[in-house]
């Protein structure tokens, strides 16, 4: 089936739903394709305490459900589908979905987000949300006065480790090399922090824990040279080996930087293709917060309205 629309939004995280709310209120009748993970990364977060407007802790899935309902109530058509292919070579742009539908859109807002890179071991998946996390700001509070392991050696890992010392008694950074890639200033801060210790030349072999209640109790680490395995006791494991923006669909059709983020013009959500806009973590390598994603979704919607009214 071929469907035409003025605005098509790809992705249903805070950026996509914010863009939907604003374009709908501009009477543009947007269509939003919610993707493989409706609601985005927040659906993987149980307790949300840093989104403005809520005095008490809220649940990530609940917040995204509320945003989705709000978008629908103001006139957004939300489609349960995923995008397989796009053609951005000319307007109207063409979008092909997994269910076989074809959309033609005068403008597109890309809000496909970015996913945390994971270790790829079975135990990591088993305890995700039960002691395994990739967001210290989101989940660090729940490990107050406990021991935590951070995995990684770049800026993200060191920033996470330093932040977690606000909550944890002890933070152990496990890194597969014998030096960090992170900026020198971050390394200096980390080495001076009495709560942080570093284990070099090790990888995570297994995350161990209990089932009743389901919780992490430690990690087995493996020396990359000797293969010797040791146990480090901890209550939480934070994976900080980087983020991977979901931009594979758009490669070769739109400007993407060396880190695979969509390039937008300074102070704008406009891309190098007229009529195509990008918002949220798919183009934001610095902040990566729900509130900043929602804000950029609003920006994209306002810019789309201006573009279509030329």
Swiss-Prot record:
FAD binds at residues 34-41, 281-290. PROSITE patterns: PYRIDINE_REDOX_2. Binds 1 FAD per subunit. InterPro entries: FAD/NAD-bd_sf, FAD/NAD-binding_dom, Ferredoxin-NADP_redctase_2, Pyr_nucl-diS_OxRdtase_2_AS, Thioredox_Rdtase. Disulfide bonds join 135-138. Its cofactor is FAD. GO terms for biological process: removal of superoxide radicals. Signal peptide: none annotated. Its main location: cytoplasm. GO terms for molecular function: thioredoxin-disulfide reductase (NADPH) activity. Its EC number is 1.8.1.9. GO terms for cellular component: cytoplasm. It is an enzyme of class 1 (oxidoreductase). It comes from the Bacteria. The active site is a redox-active disulfide bond. Homodimer. Belongs to the class-II pyridine nucleotide-disulfide oxidoreductase family. This is Thioredoxin reductase. The lineage of its organism: Bacteria, Pseudomonadati, Pseudomonadota, Alphaproteobacteria, Rickettsiales. The gene is trxB.
